[in-house]
Amino acid sequence: MSIAGVAAQEIRVPLKTGFLHNGRAMGNMRKTYWSSRSEFKNNFLNIDPITMAYSLNSSAQERLIPLGHASKSAPMNGHCFAENGPSQKSSLPPLLIPPSENLGPHEEDQVVCGFKKLTVNGVCASTPPLTPIKNSPSLFPCAPLCERGSRPLPPLPISEALSLDDTDCEVEFLTSSDTDFLLEDSTLSDFKYDVPGRRSFRGCGQINYAYFDTPAVSAADLSYVSDQNGGVPDPNPPPPQTHRRLRRSHSGPAGSFNKPAIRISNCCIHRASPNSDEDKPEVPPRVPIPPRPVKPDYRRWSAEVTSSTYSDEDRPPKVPPREPLSPSNSRTPSPKSLPSYLNGVMPPTQSFAPDPKYVSSKALQRQNSEGSASKVPCILPIIENGKKVSSTHYYLLPERPPYLDKYEKFFREAEETNGGAQIQPLPADCGISSATEKPDSKTKMDLGGHVKRKHLSYVVSP
């Protein structure tokens, strides 16, 4: 005996389906099969359309309705698939499939699809077990209590009072979209706290308004609107605002059938809308900006200057103009950057004194009393062979003493007297007189050298 036969006898379940060859349909199944006495009565567990709605479409559902209480014996392809005992509970005609060796591809697909869906719902097994397993759970969900290590499945909670519309609503809840729900022409039931629905705990929880498009309205807003309208409702209320459908119930457990709908009156919606004029706060009028205060008088106040004598027409004291700065950044500027003097004559040292226009009278009086204006320094340029050697170097001699004026006056008078007496009596001795005058003039030049230097001090070659 093969391993599959041993496993079949151990589990005591009839092997009703054969092996498929390369995915072929049920018509090409092998002829070898195992059969034994069965412990359970019915192959199919009261398959109702309500149960099959979760996994089958409408066409398959119509096809499988007669299978609810089908017979145990059904001839297929000339082989017996049923159990040995006759059916006692069957009241509907059995499912008959005409035997044919070559089924069309469309018919084969229908047969295989139907049996696959029955296998998903736990009606029959696809293949026999390969090895005997004693303590493992049953491979056949429909196995009886005598099966080792397995427990029967609880019956499905199907109520006869439940209408097909409620079931379709639940199926539609899992399959349809929000757009299809909004297009339905149905009235929404009002939310009830006192009457609990089936499998729901209404009244035990709170409503989460975050799932709704319409905002939550407090009791204060409701009382405010009723007082404002004077207790008179709006004669022409607009249609209620459609809110989006909830995916999960906010008051009951997940998957409750009755979805509550909350309706808020138009006045409440209008009150809570952000675009309404009543919701906007009243803005007080702007306070006029006061004019800028007059700028206080920050001028200097003293006993000598009063407000009457001080006027805006008075001008500040004069400031001496600045001399143009040299473009060079060196600390010792070149002579070319120095100011040029008129006629090439360098002014005396007193020219560096402050300008009398911007100097107080007391300073000028002090300079005049000291005699600084009459004193002139003696500057002698360096001359070689009748030419000035340098324009930057010179001899600075001390001030000319006053007694030299007497010597200069004496030598001038002596020249005039001696020169006129020698030239007149002896006109023929011009050569001798000229020879004698030359040493005399030379001595006069030596004696009056300091006098001549005074005149040379003012001549400076450019």
Curated annotation (Swiss-Prot):
Induction remarks: Levels are very low in quiescent cells. Up-regulated by mitogens.
Effect of substituting M346A: Abolishes inhibition of EGFR activity
Basic and acidic residues compositional bias, start-end: 312-321, 437-448
Pfam families assigned: GTPase_binding, Inhibitor_Mig-6
GO molecular function, one term: GTPase activator activity
Compartmental location: Cytoplasm; Cell membrane; Nucleus
Positions carrying Phosphoserine: S251, S273, S302, S461
Effect in UniProt of substituting F352A: Abolishes inhibition of EGFR activity
InterPro entries reported in the protein's UniProt record: Cdc42-bd-like, EGFR_SigReg_Kinase, Mig-6
Modified residues (N-acetylserine): S2
Region Disordered, residue ranges: 225-374, 415-448
Biological process (GO), any one: response to xenobiotic stimulus
Membrane-topology descriptor: Peripheral membrane protein
Chain intervals with Polar residues compositional bias: 326-337, 362-372
GO terms for cellular component: cytoplasm; cytosol; nucleus; plasma membrane
Keywords from the UniProt entry: Acetylation, Cell membrane, Cytoplasm, Membrane, Nucleus, Phosphoprotein, Tumor suppressor
Region (Interaction with EGFR and ERBB2 and regulation of EGFR activation): 334-363
Pro residues: bias regions: 284-293
UniProt record similarity statement: Belongs to the MIG6 family.
Domain notes per entry: The EGFR-binding region prevents binding of a cyclin-like activator to the EGFR kinase domain, and thereby keeps EGFR in an inactive conformation. Also maintains EGFR in an inactive conformation by preventing formation of an asymmetric homodimer.
Self-association and partners: Interacts with ERBB2. Interacts with EGFR.
Protein name: ERBB receptor feedback inhibitor 1
Lineage, top ranks: Eukaryota, Metazoa, Chordata, Craniata, Vertebrata
Gene transcribed to yield this protein: ERRFI1
